From Swiss-Prot:
Residues 1-23 are annotated as: Disordered. It comes from Arabidopsis thaliana. The gene is BHLH111. It is found in: Nucleus. Its main location: nucleus. This is Transcription factor bHLH111.
Amino acid sequence: MDHHHHIASRNSSTTSELPSFEPACHNGNGNGWIYDPNQVRYDQSSDQRLSKLTDLVGKHWSIAPPNNPDMNHNLHHHFDHDHSQNDDISMYRQALEVKNEEDLCYNNGSSGGGSLFHDPIESSRSFLDIRLSRPLTDINPSFKPCFKALNVSEFNKKEHQTASLAAVRLGTTNAGKKKRCEEISDEVSKKAKCSEGSTLSPEKELPKAKLRDKITTLQQIVSPFGKTDTASVLQEAITYINFYQEQVKLLSTPYMKNSSMKDPWGGWDREDHNKRGPKHLDLRSRGLCLVPISYTPIAYRDNSATDYWNPTYRGSLYR
């Protein structure tokens, strides 16, 4: 009973201190609505207890309530000073000791009053630790922002690899194009050379063929003593040409009045004349007679017949 009387006295003191609120309108008859502070009822014991504990938190504790036995002892002593030493107060104090930590955790962030939500001690302490010492993003890991650091070196490496692959592909394509162009140019040049060779080869080989044919013909005509080598054939051809030149000179001398040339055979006859006596020097003495072709018989002018007027080859050497 003493305990209940003490709580009632405290309720009367706290309600007397509350400010009075004037009504918005007043009824003149005196029976209208009048604000009565006594009608507002609170849990005065809990409100007063929370306000005292809040003052203790503001004076002695900084952020979170530590597990300090001295502070708990002071708190118990404070309540023992206000209440009596009967069994009801001891039971109330034990309940207060159990709930003091969660009440203090609640009142530390509040201004006193309002609704009171009792949470377990472990959850209230972990909530304060998270709220006061850890960042807000750690409360709910699902909402934690995840930023992946951009590795510039790997990005540059990948970009360099892609650029190198593109350059290699471009180089291979350019090399293939160059090879094709070179092959086409080589084929065109080879075809041009073949066509030029085919056009120029007959002209180059024609003189050689003619010279070969001439040498073969000369070998067939002139074959001195069965010799067919080129040196012997050419030497015999030179001798043959010199003989015909002498014959032309000899036969053309009588028709050339101003000619001082003499017949080489006449020189031989002169020597014989000096030895044996004078002789008449003419062509008839040598068995030669020059007459115009118009006076010769027609039979002798036939090409198929033998020309008796022409001297035989090497006829003068074998006389």
